[in-house]
């Protein structure tokens, strides 16, 4: 048996090593609690033999021992053993994403000369600015004209369930809280318990899809990716880009900067798929609009609760009349229209209840127009910092995702 844990020593950074070891210990406790000491000992034995095999590549003995142990196992035990290591690798990936976020925070908050790896957006543009053969204005104009299309599609080999993707997302959020509260032992205990509970739920959840997903289910999977990840990521990416240009040129990118748009084949790819009918496509589009209305309504509610200011532009006062909360009064009709859209589409999707198009929010400009008025008012009243916060994030989301979150690409037949 190895005296040192060589597996963890191979992990590049201490913070990542600590997170991987922490999650590995939690998983071990859950396995022991759920499956018993005997199975836990089996997992540990295979783990230690695997590490010995990696450390002694010229010796075949550890690998032979692994094979001999596996040959003794019943199909059920082998399945559980596979799950244990599969979950560990998923937790490793999760720890890597948290460590990348931590590295990015360090990049943004500390001035240093040392080059960072894997911060690809910053690294690309920093290299551009260091190249004296390329004028800064040219880099700025290139960035302004960027046009990035990202297409979401359901791969037939994708077997991970949406519910587990959401569980990993929830676990990531708790771990990020834990990183912020390292100096608060009592709060750490609460979070440690939450993490143990989440890992227990994950261990007891079937992680494999047992039936082929319908086109509508594929679309829900894509929408879950947007809701759980991309919805918050897009504004952060734009902020990072903006900071790079402010640092190197003394000015940020235009406020209408929006190079990224999403498309989707889910519910629109009819090539060789007779189940994607016109009705299916219609329902997928409505499902996307339903999800979009829900996300925008949530963001609008947050904005309305925050904007208690009284000073505003004449343009807003002309609409609201005299009030102590002009921004709230001005934004509520948009929030209510989003809520109405969400409920009308939900009624159709769940009960086939018809709706009037007039009840729905029909284009992205219906969101952007009132938000622009609010932004202009804030800028006129010495509140540019507020205008550049949650409001700007919401406007960037509206430009990126529109009212359907992703454009639905229709493919009737592949040779066309």
Predicted regions and their residues:
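Often metal-dependent polyanion-binding catalytic scaffolds in large enzymes
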Residues: 1-416
């Amino acid at each position: 048996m190895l005296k040192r844990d060589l597996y963890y020593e191979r992990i590049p950074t201490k913070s990542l090593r600590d997170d991987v070891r922490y999650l590995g210990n939690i998983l071990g406790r859950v396995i022991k609690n759920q499956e018993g000491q005997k199975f836990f000992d089996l997992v540990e034995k295979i783990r230690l033999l695997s590490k010995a095999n990696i450390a002694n590549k010229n010796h075949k003995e550890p690998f032979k021992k692994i094979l001999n142990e596996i040959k003794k196992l019943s199909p059920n035990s082998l399945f559980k053993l596979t799950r244990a290591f599969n979950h560990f690798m998923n937790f490793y990936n999760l720890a890597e994403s948290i460590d990348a976020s931590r590295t990015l925070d360090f990049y943004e908050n500390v001035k240093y000369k040392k080059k960072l790896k894997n911060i690809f957006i910053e690294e690309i543009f920093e290299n551009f600015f260091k190249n004296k053969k390329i004028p800064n204005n040219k880099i700025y104009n290139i960035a302004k004209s960027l046009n990035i299309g990202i297409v979401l599609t359901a791969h037939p080999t994708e077997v991970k369930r949406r519910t587990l993707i959401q569980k990993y997302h929830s676990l990531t959020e708790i771990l990020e809280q834990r990183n912020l509260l390292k100096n608060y032992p009592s709060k750490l205990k609460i979070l440690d318990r939450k993490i143990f509970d989440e890992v227990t739920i994950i261990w007891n959840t079937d992680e494999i899809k047992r039936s082929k997903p319908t086109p509508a289910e594929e679309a829900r999977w894509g929408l879950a990716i947007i809701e759980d990840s991309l919805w918050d990521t897009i504004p952060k990416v734009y902020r990072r880009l903006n900071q790079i240009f402010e640092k190197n040129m003394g000015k940020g990118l235009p406020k209408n900067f929006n190079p990224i748009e999403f498309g989707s084949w889910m519910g629109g790819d009819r090539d060789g798929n007779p189940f994607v009918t016109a009705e299916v496509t219609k329902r997928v589009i409505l499902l996307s609009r339903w999800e979009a209305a829900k996300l925008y309504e949530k963001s609008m509610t947050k904005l309305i609760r925050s904007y208690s200011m009284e000073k505003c532009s004449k343009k807003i006062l002309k609409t609201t009349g005299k009030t102590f909360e002009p921004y709230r009064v001005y934004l509520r009709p948009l929030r209510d229209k989003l809520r109405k859209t969400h409920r009308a589409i939900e009624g159709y999707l769940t009960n086939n209840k018809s709706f009037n198009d007039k009840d729905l929010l029909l284009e992205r400009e219906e969101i952007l127009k009132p938000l622009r008025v609010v932004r202009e008012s804030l800028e006129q009243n010495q509140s540019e910092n507020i205008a550049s916060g949650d409001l700007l994030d919401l406007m960037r989301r509206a430009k990126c995702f529109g009212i359907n979150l992703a454009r639905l690409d229709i493919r009737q037949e592949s040779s066309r």
